[in-house]
Structures are given as structure tokens and as C-alpha cells.
Amino acid sequence: MSEISVTQTLDTLGLRCPEPVMLVRKNIRHLNDGEILLIIADDPATTRDIPSFCQFMDHTLLQSEVEKPPFKYWVKRGK
């Protein structure tokens, strides 16, 4: 995938469920549609929770790196 232009980065390293998703929800609210939030996490639950959050809240998971921590997720606000 080509370079993704990140609007904001959210570091949730050391936080455990449900804190990472709660912070994602809080931070993505401040972005405009089409802007991108990069989430960095080490909680294994985020590999399930972030994609589910995107689907439920109608955001787009552009890319993820979940082979080993730290995990990274590029989420675009909106579809």
C-alpha cells in the first residue's frame, strides 16, 4: 500500500481493554471525515476490537499491522 497521510497519531501502549477503543472513539470525534488516525497499541484485544469498532461506527480500517506488538492501525474517519 502507498504511503498513508496520517492526520493524528494515538499511542495506547500499556493500556488494556477497554481503554484503547475508548480513546480511539474520543480522538476520532475530533477529526473531519476522510482524516486518518494512526493507532499504536500492544493490547492483543485490539486486533479484534479496532476492526469491530470501525465496522460498528462506520469508519474505514485502511491498513493494520498485527503480526507482533506494537500493533498499528490506520483508521479513516467515515467511509
Curated annotation (Swiss-Prot):
Gene3D superfamilies from the entry?
TusA-like domain
Q: What does the similarity note say?
A: Belongs to the sulfur carrier protein TusA family.
Which HAMAP family does this one have? Thiourid_synth_A
Task performed by this protein: Sulfur carrier protein which probably makes part of a sulfur-relay system.
Q: Where in the cell is it found?
A: Cytoplasm
What's the chief localization of this chain?
cytoplasm
GO BP, one example? Answer: tRNA wobble position uridine thiolation
Check the record and name the InterPro entries matching this protein: Sulphur_carrier_TusA, TusA-like, TusA-like_sf
Record keywords: Cytoplasm
Q: Which domain of life, per UniProt?
A: Bacteria
Taken from the UniProt entry, a GO cellular component term is: cytoplasm
Kindly identify the residues recorded as the active site.
C17
Q: What is the lineage of its organism?
A: Bacteria, Pseudomonadati, Pseudomonadota, Gammaproteobacteria, Pasteurellales
- The protein depicted here goes by the name Sulfur carrier protein TusA
Any one GO molecular-function label of the UniProt entry: sulfur carrier activity
